[in-house]
Amino acid sequence: MASSALICDTEQWKGLQAHVGAIQKTHLRDLMDDAERCKAMTAEYEGIFLDYSRQRATGETMEKLFKLAEAAKLKEKIEKMFSGDKINSTENRSVLHVALRAPRDEVIKSDGVNVVPEVWGVKDKIKQFSETFRSGSWVGATGKALTNVVSVGIGGSFLGPLFVHAALQTDPEAAESAKGRQLRFLANVDPVDVARSIKDLDPETTLVVVVSKTFTTAETMLNARTLKEWIVSSLGPDAVAKHMIAVSTNLELVEKFGIDPKNAFAFWDWVGGRYSVCSAVGVLPLSLQYGFPIVQKFLEGAASIDKHFRSSSFEKNIPVLLGLLSVWNVSFLGYPARAILPYSQALEKFAPHIQQLSMESNGKGVSIDGVQLSFETGEIDFGEPGTNGQHSFYQLIHQGRVIPCDFIGVVKSQQPVYLKGEIVSNHDELMSNFFAQPDALAYGKTPEQLHSEKVPEHLISHKTFQGNRPSLSLLLPSLSAYEIGQLLSIYEHRIAVQGFLWGINSFDQWGVELGKSLASQVRKSLHASRMEGKPVQGFNSSTASLLTRYLAVEPSTPYNTTTMPKV
């Protein structure tokens, strides 16, 4: 039977609710005048520096949040995750993405069995295969070495690996290792995405990685069949075994598809899709592109934060602090969104990955016991690298809705540039904005300041910035594979902390099921109409009208022959 105990019923939660009034009367201009407060609101680990002094919080706020963490049994929940307890209760599964990057000699159990040796078994297999592939020993159907990889997956099988790939592309060591190679991703079932993923590629030199745990994911398998047709039409049916491999646990369907089961790489049901980038889902395609040693550095970076998260006191624990502040902003100050603003173009795919990781994890309306929540959980996550975002949506952030911001900066650029005679280097120009924007949000600009600057009266209200808009700054020493892994792990654990405090299950995603079920009905109707001329039926009047309009136009792909992208 579901328990009615919710975190919002605790004295600690109610104490924070009462505390909101005091914070509402305080402006960040005044809070930032307290140098001791600013110094206290920092944390550092392995050169990663967090400054959260521009949050609408005081020392008292933080103490109350730490007490809320105690009431939520946060430490106990973290230990349960690392110990392999089945904290994903709706699916009766452990949550062990931390095992994917654990050292070889570590013991992490699920159902009483240490999973680390099995994880390393898959990693060793990936290492061996990637070395064979990259050396040119693995050749395609025509005897040519393969230099192009297309990874076919969707959701977590796509967004996480894409983020890491984009971040590594301009790292000097990774770029050198990837010379002469291409890694692309195919996710959307839209045929345009198929066309883009294979544009200018030669099937003779291309390897396709099909990522689907069950080998039944509708979009992924349709895309896989499409790329199979692309290969077979050019090289013949026997080429599939040399040009397609899989990340899956369903070896029967892998073999039926035409892929040699020896070339299938496993992952486990205790790895959620959005947490799977450190499994074969990400490690395999990334190792094919960059080499396993570089990917291992990425995994080691993630593992370093796992250790920090598990062992550091909450007061200096970066993921815990971030999670607590997010709960404060969402559930007490009422801010529904979060902007993720990396001042590094290499992190251009970070916000989309965190968008899925956060919103799929914490977009829940009931407690882990199935009790309807009386408070909001989760945020609307979005973002864009600086300074591009400044010329896009910062207007709203400065003078519209209040949206807490995560500013992520890097001390040492992957690609330093300086033009003789310029005032600053290109990276210093970028970082000038990184350091300025949080203060602009916090302090704002008053009518009095504008009057002193002789701004015309009719423009005073337009040029006034209220300020008092919260942000935090996360400064990384550099952006090598190691730091990329650290950044990923920080956000993974931050999001888990939020879920642990709210008392929800951050590791299931039942919300994606209904739409898929309804799409199945539409798919059957489209088939019946296209192939048998049957009228649209079984839908509400609006959907029926839309479907009828769609079907009234002659399809661009006749159903009596195979049609492939024209690229």
From Swiss-Prot:
Keyword Nuclease: no
Enzyme Commission (EC) number: 5.3.1.9
GO cellular component term, pick one: cytosol
Compartments where found: Cytoplasm
Chain sites annotated for binding D-glucose 6-phosphate: G156, S157, S212, K213, T214, F215, T216, T217, Q356, E360, H391, K516
Swiss-Prot/TrEMBL keywords: Cytoplasm, Gluconeogenesis, Glycolysis, Isomerase
Stored InterPro entries: G6P_Isomerase, G6P_Isomerase_C, Phosphoglucose_isomerase_CS, SIS_dom_sf, SIS_PGI_1, SIS_PGI_2
Cited CDD domains: SIS_PGI_1, SIS_PGI_2
Catalysed transformations (reactions): alpha-D-glucose 6-phosphate = beta-D-fructose 6-phosphate
Molecular function, one GO term: isomerase activity
Family, as annotated: Belongs to the GPI family.
Quaternary context: Homodimer.
This protein's name: Glucose-6-phosphate isomerase, cytosolic B
Source organism per UniProt: Oryza sativa subsp. japonica
